[in-house]
Structure formats: C-alpha cells, structure tokens
C-alpha cells in the first residue's frame, strides 16, 4: 500500500484530470475572424507559406478575374473560397501553390459608370483617368471582402488587366496572332447592342422572353413565266400572288435582298382567294388555317427548281424606293418546323442570311444596311428614316398592309437575345470588325484555330467530366470571334489602316511593338495621345489610327500570356494546372482563354478545368432582387462568421446548384459546433501533454489507441484522394462523421474514463494522449483548407511555437503494425457495442438502470465476434461503458444476445463505476480499489482500452 497521506477534505482528496483549454467552446466567429485576417496580414502568413514551399513542385491555379465593379456577392464568395480550398489543400499536399488574385478592369460597365457620374461629353483622356481611378477604388473594396472570407493570396500585388505592363503585353499578344495569320477584317453580322453602341461577345448575350410581332408577307411574282415553268406549267393560271415568308422581325423587311428555300423540300403552288401562293407543301394546311384562306395545291416542285427566280419586294407598291426584286437562293438551314418553309433574307441582320448571300456572289458594298449603331434607320430610308427599329415595327406592318403584301399579323412570345448589361434587346448587325477566324488557315499551314482548340479540349481534364462535351460543342459550332469593340476604355487594336483600302500598314508588327513599349511606360493613354507621324512619318497622310478596342474577353483571355508569363512570371508558370470558375465560363473565360492560347501556343492554357454551379435558395430558385431571396455574404459573415460560409461551400456538391437558406445555414452551424466541440475536447486533454517528454512509442500503446490512429490514418488517405480530385463535400461529410461518430460517439467516449481517472503520467493515460496528439495533428491539417480560421485558432493552442498551420503539410501518421487487421477487429467490436448500447437504452427506458455504468452486461457471441470480445478481457467493460461485462461463447449467430442487469454493488464517488471493492480501504469508504490504486499506488493496468 502507498504511504501517501490523503487529504481529509472529500472534494480535494479525489481529483480527476478535468483539464481546460484556451480554445473556447463558442467560436465567436464574427468577432475573432477579422482579428485573424489582421494577424495573417501583419505577420505575413502568405509570404511564410511561399517561403516554406520553395523548391517543391509547382501547382498553379490561375485566378479568373472578377470584374472591378460593385460589391462582392455570394457567387464571388463561392468562387473565391473554392479556389482558396484548392490552393491550401495543394500547398498542404507538398506543392508550391501560389495564389495571385486578379481583376478585369477595362470595358463597358466601368465606362457606363463614368458616363453616369460625369456625363458623355468627357474628353477621352479624362474618361481614361476616371476609369482607372474607379477600377482601383472598386478593387480595393472587393479585396477587403475577399480577405474577410479567409482567402490567403498575393493581395499586395494582384494582377490587374489595366496595369501598364499587362496592357502592353496584350498588344504584343495581338501582334503574335496577326503574325500567325488568324486575324482579318470584314463586314459581318455581329451581336450589337444599341445601348452599348458596340459589338458584343457571345458571352455577353443572355436570352429573355419577349413578345414581338410575327407577320406572314407576300413577295409578288416578278417572273411569272419562269415560275410557271419551274412548277412544270406552261403558264400561271392567274397573275396575282407570289411567295410567302414568315418573320418575327418586321424591321428587317426594308433591308430584304433575297429569299432562301431548302433544295430538297417540296414547294407547292396553292390557288387561294389572295392569288397563287408559293410555300412548302407540308406547311400548306397550317398556313391556310392561319391566313383564314381556302386553298388548292395545283402544282409541286422541289426547292432546287425555284433557284434564282425573282420576286418583287413587298413594299414596292408603297414607295418607289423599294422597287427592286429579291432572288431565290438555296440553303440547307431552311426548315419546315414553323412558318412557310421560305426564309426572307436581310444579309446585314442575320448570320445565315449573310453567309448565304455572300456565297451567291453578293459583295460587301451590295449589302443594304440602313440600321445605325444607335438602333435608328438612316434618314434616307424610304418611309421609315429616323425611326428606331422598334418604333418602326408597327409602321412597317401598316405599310405592308397598304401595299397588299400582308397575309397575317399576330404577337409572338419567344426567347430573344438581350444585352447582359443593359437587359435590352439586341440584334445581329453587319459592321466592319476585326475577327479571329475559326477556320482560317494559319500562316504556317497548320491546323485551323477550331481544330487546334478542339484537340486542346480533348487533352484537358474536366471536373465534373460533363464540361468536356459542353465546351467541345461550343467550340465546334461557334462563329469567328469578333475581336473589336467600339469603346474608349479598353486596350487599343493599335493598327494604322489605309484611309482608302482599309489595309493594315505593311510595318504593322513592328509598329505594334513600338506602341507596346509606349503603353508599358504610359498605359493605353499613350495610344490615345499618339500623333501618327511620330511612328509612321509622312505615311500619316495615307494611314489613320484604328479606333477599335479589343474585346474585354481578349483582356482576360490572354492572362495566361500577360500574367502567367508576364507580370507574375516569377511566381506562376504556363500552362496553369487549373482554371476554376462558374459553369457560365464555358462560353466566357474558359472559352476565350482556350482560343487565345490555341492561337499563341497551339494548346490549352490549362491542364484542368473545374466548374461550379450557381447559388439558389432553399427551394431551388435563382436568387433575384424581385424574389427578395438573395443572401449577402457580408451579412452572413458578420452574423454567423465567414467560417460558416466556407463550411457551407465545402459541404455542398458544387458540380450542381448550391442551395442556401437560413435553415441550411442553421444546419451548417450545428455541424460546425460539433467539429469545434471535438477540437476543444482534444486540446483540453492534451493541455498537460508534452510530446517530446510524454509520448510513448506505438508498441506501448493500448490496443484501442493503436486502432484509433490506424483508423485516422486510413481516413486521411481517403480524404487526400478526395482533395486530389477537388471533391470537397465528401471530405466534409467524412470528417463530420469522424468527429461525431468515430471520435465523439466511440473513441473519445471510451477514452474519458482513462483520461479522467488514470494517474496523470500513467502509461495508460499517456498512451491515450499520444494517440490523441497524432489524431489532432492529422485532423487540424485536413480541416485547414476549408475551416481555415478554426484550424489556425486550434493550431496556435496546440502548437504555440509554430507560426501557422498553413506552412504545414499533411500529417505523416506513425506506422501501426497490423493496421488492417486491427481496423477490421475494432469495426466488429463497434458493431457489437451498437447492439449493447441498444440493449442498455431499452433497460434505461424500462427504468431498470439509470446510467450505463449502473449496468453489468453479458454478451453471448459466436465466431469472430466472440474472439474479438474475449480478447479484450476485463477491458471490455471500458469499451461498453459499463461497470462489468462478460462474454459467453455460443455456437451460432442466431443464439447471440445481450443481457443487461443492474449492478448490486455500490458506486464509486470518483469514477462512478459500480464495484464490489468500493470502500475496501477504510480510510476511503467511497472510493473503489481501481481509483485508490490510480491515486495512491502504481495505478491500474490496462492492455486494450
């Protein structure tokens, strides 16, 4: 017996190891997170990560630049936090993974803001200066928001497309693709916004429902004899009539120059009260009903027989200015799904119309193009000059009616193109623009841009995989890229073009380099103020400065050139490992970057593309002001903490829509608390543990501790495989299960007795603490990519001598001998424990026992279950959290059972176990023999648990 004298005071004489930790139960995230943001910045944590990562293999996530305009919204938060999780997880996986954030700075939205604030009459130099200042102000505002979300990066030196070096390198990239033969100038219908006064990129177009007039119009016979012969008739039985078209754009009728028929569709000559009408045979019945006519088909012929016939313009009778005829051209794009099977062609206002007319010999100068950039007809247009096309629509209908050419006029609801900025309808409009040719043979005679880009898509990894087919289809079907824009605040297409021929100056490549050098020093303003004579001397009499600017998608689409290999080449490299954006960027940044890199380098600028969905409310509805269902990330961060936003994003399958609501945030917060409570338990029970002095080698651990570490190591391997594939939601799901079930529901539950009641420095307790130390090392690191604030807070308590968790790599768990067999055995034991817990709960419900420690259980088991249980010996009771446990072998699984009885022994005051030896020591009548030994002797001996 020990000679220790026990204190006679009952509360002080039987202490248990209930320890505290400075890691609080309440996260108080809205208050603490901003302090961490300041701390990370003040101590240069991002720079420390970079220093720690030197010499490792590079991993480059290239930031797709948000536009420098407006506050950050929830979509920004999703995007930036996903990127942050990727970068942090790659750094911890042993890579050098820098994060250089960037901003898209030129373009229409900022120019519109300047116009709103200062009017439209500012000199160009002032527009530039104010646009730069505005973009800078917006960047600083957004930067604060991104940092508040816990995103670490090169915030002191981000890339900006408006930085002089980036602007200059973009001009050099333009020179390269001209040199390679991809760029040409031509008249083509492009997406045109009247409010922007400029061409739009495909990615700047959105579709909205709209109601427009729909009309069926008669083009009268101009060659009745030829028409009769085409239908196999000697002559037409009557002179009245013609060919019928259907359109939803009456405003294009004044510019009609042709009619398109499908060569293989059968067309009918129909005798009606309105004369002879030509239309597709399979549309006759529907059209007669729509027109309110009765008709009889008197002849049929395939479309090819009608080629080159001419018909009078439908407004010829309304004004002499329309006394012209329209030829019939053949086109495979004509269908009979709707309308009459005849398409009226205004080549200035439709891509297929334009292509067809050009293919049939029409020159650019032949094309009638009366709509100006502001949406008004030129003043000289007969009947409608000076009107906007939308105001002209009803007047054109009236004029057609007066001319006897209108067969039907109704309203038609359909999905129509709109400008993504102004939300106003746009049109196709033929303008002289600079294009990158998708099917143009490059100067080296190699593959076309389309072929190269499609090959690059095939060579790219997609997350999720369906993105490959989507981008492939977009590239396969897209038209030539309209590179030019008619704005001020943009990188100039710094060409000198011949005043008469429009040809580029023969020294264009050399001149572009000269301009780039000036832009490098002074920004794009250098081009605005440049006197042409400075560069081309007397040639300035023949050549003028091109006024077009580059599409802003070329700005961001060449960041692989002017950022990865330009402004930040010391940190980054080409190609990037990953581009990560919303799924709309298949037709945006992913797309433009692919095309520019295909032209410049013959490959994609990325090895992988990751796309995430958009945020929706709890009912799956898109967030909008009208529905009032928007959620502001600032408000959530200030109320619940940015950590809750991070955990919500990490726990959601980003490949689809990301649903968020107050109810969802409540569930996320509850999940966060469970993780935090687990960390608090771990840290508290390690607060008197010094790994260097107190740790035991794995061979001396109790069996359950070896199992716990083996299990944690196995889990980590699974988690790292998910991280490798950017699968974050399974990481969160498995870690939440680990914290709540594997740790809280089992291992830590079993461990409490040993941690609290064993002698502080006993091998049994140090075994448990050594295992907890390893589990905590591993757990904090796998949490860090998404629970960054919490992992850092816990790490500073756990490893106070370390600067930050973010310079660590994933933990190397100690090797556990026979780990696989150990995990299998304890999986079986946990299964049995589940049966016992159920039986204990039934006994508690029946008021046969109070707590589980009041119970003594007998487990009847067979086979491997018996072997596993029996191997624990007397430690089985600790695993089952009962005061006594015995195991009885039975022959068959069907004979297995759990018997629960209330203990008849007294309860130990200290450990709360019911034991026969409580009071065995007269000086300590309320203490069991186990606790007496742990307090005053050498302590109990355990082997398993």
UniProtKB/Swiss-Prot annotation:
Any one Gene Ontology cellular component term annotated for this protein: cytosol
UniProt superkingdom: Bacteria
Binding of ATP, residues: 625
GO biological process, one term: isoleucyl-tRNA aminoacylation
Binding note for cofactor: Binds 1 zinc ion per subunit.
UniProt keyword Ligase present: yes
Keywords per UniProt: Aminoacyl-tRNA synthetase, ATP-binding, Cytoplasm, Ligase, Metal-binding, Nucleotide-binding, Protein biosynthesis, Zinc
Known cofactor(s): Zn(2+)
Catalytic activity as recorded in UniProt: tRNA(Ile) + L-isoleucine + ATP = L-isoleucyl-tRNA(Ile) + AMP + diphosphate
Protein residues bound to Zn(2+): 908, 911, 928, 931
Entry binding sites for L-isoleucyl-5'-AMP: 581
EC class of the enzyme, as a word: ligase
UniProt cross-references to Pfam families, sorted A to Z: Anticodon_1, tRNA-synt_1, zf-FPG_IleRS
Gene Ontology MF terms in the entry: aminoacyl-tRNA deacylase activity; ATP binding; isoleucine-tRNA ligase activity; tRNA binding; zinc ion binding
EC code(s) of this entry: 6.1.1.5
Stated family: Belongs to the class-I aminoacyl-tRNA synthetase family. IleS type 1 subfamily.
Free-text comment about domains: IleRS has two distinct active sites: one for aminoacylation and one for editing. The misactivated valine is translocated from the active site to the editing site, which sterically excludes the correctly activated isoleucine. The single editing site contains two valyl binding pockets, one specific for each substrate (Val-AMP or Val-tRNA(Ile)).
Subunit structure as annotated in this protein's UniProt entry: Monomer.
The protein's name: Isoleucine--tRNA ligase 1
Organism phylogeny: Bacteria, Pseudomonadati, Pseudomonadota, Betaproteobacteria, Burkholderiales
Gene: ileS1
């Amino acid at each position: 017996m020990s000679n220790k004298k026990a204190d006679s005071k009952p509360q002080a004489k039987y202490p248990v190891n209930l320890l505290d930790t400075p890691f609080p139960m309440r996260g108080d995230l809205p208050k603490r997170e901003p302090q961490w943001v300041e701390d990370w910045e003040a101590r240069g944590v991002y720079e420390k990560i970079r220093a720690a990562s030197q010499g490792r293999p590079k991993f480059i996530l290239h930031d797709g630049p948000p536009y420098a305009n407006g506050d950050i919204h929830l979509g920004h938060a999703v995007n930036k936090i996903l990127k942050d999780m990727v970068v942090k997880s790659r750094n911890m996986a042993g890579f050098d993974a820098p994060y250089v954030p960037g901003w898209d700075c030129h373009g229409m939205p900022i120019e519109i803001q300047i116009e709103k604030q200062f009017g439209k009459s500012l000199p160009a130099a002032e527009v530039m200066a104010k646009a730069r200042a505005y973009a800078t102000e917006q960047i600083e505002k957004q930067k604060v928001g991104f940092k508040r979300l816990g995103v670490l990066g090169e915030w002191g030196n981000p890339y900006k497309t408006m930085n002089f070096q980036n602007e200059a390198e973009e001009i050099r990239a333009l020179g390269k693709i001209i040199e390679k033969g991809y760029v040409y100038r031509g008249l083509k219908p492009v997406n045109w916004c009247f409010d922007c006064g400029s061409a739009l990129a495909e990615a700047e177009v959105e579709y909205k429902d709209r109601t427009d007039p729909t009309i069926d119009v008669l083009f009268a016979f101009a060659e009745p004899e030829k028409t009769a012969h085409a239908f196999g008739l000697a002559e037409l039985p009557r002179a009245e009539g013609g060919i019928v078209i259907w359109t939803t754009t009456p405003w294009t009728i004044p510019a009609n120059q042709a009619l398109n028929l499908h060569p293989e569709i059968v067309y009918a000559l129909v005798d009606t009260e309105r004369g002879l009408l030509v239309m597709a045979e399979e549309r006759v019945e529907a059209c007669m009903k729509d027109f309110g006519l009765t008709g009889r088909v008197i002849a049929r012929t395939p479309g090819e027989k009608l080629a080159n016939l001419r018909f009078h313009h439908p407004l010829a009778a309304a004004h002499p200015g329309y006394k012209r005829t329209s030829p019939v051209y053949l086109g495979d794009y004509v269908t009979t799904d709707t309308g009459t099977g005849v398409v009226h062609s205004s080549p200035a206002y439709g891509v297929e119309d334009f292509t067809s007319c050009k293919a049939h010999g029409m020159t650019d100068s032949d094309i009638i193009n009366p709509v100006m950039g502001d949406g008004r007809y030129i003043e000289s247009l007969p009947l409608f000059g000076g009107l906007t096309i939308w105001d002209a629509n009803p007047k054109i209908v009236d004029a057609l009616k007066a001319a006897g050419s209108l067969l039907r006029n109704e309203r038609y609801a359909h999905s129509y193109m709109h400008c993504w900025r102004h939300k106003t309808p746009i049109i196709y409009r033929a303008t002289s623009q600079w294009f990158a040719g998708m099917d143009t043979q490059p100067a080296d005679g190699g593959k076309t841009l389309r072929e190269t880009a499609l090959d690059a898509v095939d060579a790219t990894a997609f997350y999720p995989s369906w993105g490959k087919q989507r981008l492939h289809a977009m590239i396969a079907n897209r038209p030539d890229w309209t590179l030019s824009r008619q704005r001020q605040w943009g990188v100039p297409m710094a060409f000198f073009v011949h005043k008469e021929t429009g040809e580029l100056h023969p020294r264009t490549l050399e001149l572009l380099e000269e301009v780039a050098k000036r832009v490098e020093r002074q920004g794009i303003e250098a081009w605005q103020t440049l006197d042409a004579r400075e560069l081309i001397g007397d040639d300035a009499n023949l050549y003028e400065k091109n006024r077009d600017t580059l599409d802003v998608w070329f700005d961001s689409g060449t960041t692989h050139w002017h950022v990865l290999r330009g402004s930040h080449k010391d940190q980054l490299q080409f190609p990037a490992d990953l581009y990560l954006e919303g799924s709309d960027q298949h037709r945006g940044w992913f797309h433009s970057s692919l095309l520019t890199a295909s032209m410049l380098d013959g490959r994609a600028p990325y090895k992988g593309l990751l796309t995430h969905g958009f945020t929706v409310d709890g009912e799956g509805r898109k967030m909008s002001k009208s529905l009032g269902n928007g959620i502001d990330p600032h408000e959530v961060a200030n109320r619940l903490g940015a950590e809750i936003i991070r955990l919500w994003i990490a726990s959601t399958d980003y490949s689809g829509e990301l649903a968020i609501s107050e109810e969802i945030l409540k569930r996320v917060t509850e999940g966060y608390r469970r993780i935090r409570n687990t960390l608090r338990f771990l840290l508290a029970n390690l607060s008197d543990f010094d790994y260097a002095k107190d740790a035991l080698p794995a061979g001396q651990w109790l069996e359950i501790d070896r199992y716990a570490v083996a299990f944690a190591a196995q889990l980590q391997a699974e988690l790292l495989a998910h991280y490798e594939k950017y699968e974050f939601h399974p990481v969160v799901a498995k870690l939440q299960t680990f914290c709540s079930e594997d740790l809280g529901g089992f291992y830590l539950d079993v461990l409490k007795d040993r941690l609290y009641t064993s002698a502080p420095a006993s091998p049994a307790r140090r075994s448990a603490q050594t295992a907890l130390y390893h589990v905590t090392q591993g757990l904090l690191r796998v949490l860090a990519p998404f629970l960054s604030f919490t992992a850092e807070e816990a790490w500073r308590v756990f490893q106070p001598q370390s600067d930050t968790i973010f310079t660590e790599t994933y933990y190397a768990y100690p090797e556990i001998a026979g780990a696989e067999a150990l995990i299998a055995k304890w999986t079986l034991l946990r299964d049995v424990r589940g049966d016992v817990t159920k039986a204990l709960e039934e006994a508690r419900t029946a008021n046969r026992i109070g707590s589980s420690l009041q119970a003594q259980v007998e487990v009847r088991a067979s086979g491997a279950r018996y072997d596993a249980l029996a191997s624990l010996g007397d430690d089985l009771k600790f695993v089952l959290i009962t005061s006594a446990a015995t195991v009885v072998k039975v022959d068959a699984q069907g004979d297995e059972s759990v018997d629960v009885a209330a203990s008849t022994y007294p309860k130990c005051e200290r450990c709360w176990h019911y034991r026969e030896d409580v009071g065995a020591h007269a000086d300590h009548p309320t203490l069991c023999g186990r606790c007496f030994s742990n307090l005053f002797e050498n302590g109990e001996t355990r082997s398993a648990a």
